[in-house]
Amino acid sequence: MGNEDFLNKIIHGDSMKLLDKLEENSIDVVLTDPPYFLDKMDNNWDDDTVSSTDNHYAVKSLPAGMKFDRKHGIKFYEWYFEIAKKIKKILKPGGFFFSFSSPRLYHRMGCAVDDAKLLIRDCFIWLYSMNQPKAMSLNHFIDKMEVEEEVKEKIKDELDGWKTPKVKSCFEPILMAQKKQDKTYLNNILKHGVGLFNTKVKIGEDMFPANVMKIEEGHEILDRYFLVPKPDKEEKGEFNTHKTVKPLKICEYLIKLSAFSDNAIILDPFVGSGTTAVAAKKLNKKFIGIDVNKEYVEIAKKRLENV
């Protein structure tokens, strides 16, 4: 099986297995949003496990009731290290790897990609404000204390406003890495058609490409450069049940920034509802999308039909 069996298709399957079937040194850009936790199953999941769950979706943060443990981060590192090694193998020399992450696990992702011998180039920041604070009051636990009510009320008054150490999350990091180029940048772009950034690409007005992007209106000056629309129902599709759909504009921006060749292949090994593939198709680039979730594969295919 070669790339021709994957090109411009959404494939249902496990990327840990399918990435080995892609040709070496053949992918221009990898743009993906990997799963971190899947219904309290960490990364020990497969198609049968996903299909047997009631709510089979990948989420960025911990599922309700699940406590974060260092083991989760370690398991994620071990899993993504193997993924990153496979990605390095199939990327062209100078090819780019963009991976959405979360503040809590970005360091594990960065170490996994770095240890796979890909070059960490930068970190893009996607800013937003539409998110709920997750800090928790301790009143519920105070109520369970076996002490007099007056003592409970006194403790509550003393701890008024003091909650668990969790702030409102307002950004999402996007790791940017690159496979080592073949000799010089000039040699690499002429031989492999990848490895440079298109500095004419802007999110806003009259500014060199930046690594900060925001999706809501705010400061007037920032809005000139970093405004990225939040995906609405029309963009996602009324049928789209995916929980963490990324803005199409961000994916388009990263592809336009990094994909030089007209024949560039954009790979998303965790394609979800297909935003990366939709962006690539809109920009007349070739794409490969892979996902273990059958429901998301069908959603992605349906979204592509509307492009």
List the predicted regions and their residue ranges.
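Short conserved loop adjoining the S-adenosyl-L-methionine
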Residues: 18-24
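A short helix-to-beta-strand connector/capping loop
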Residues: 3-9
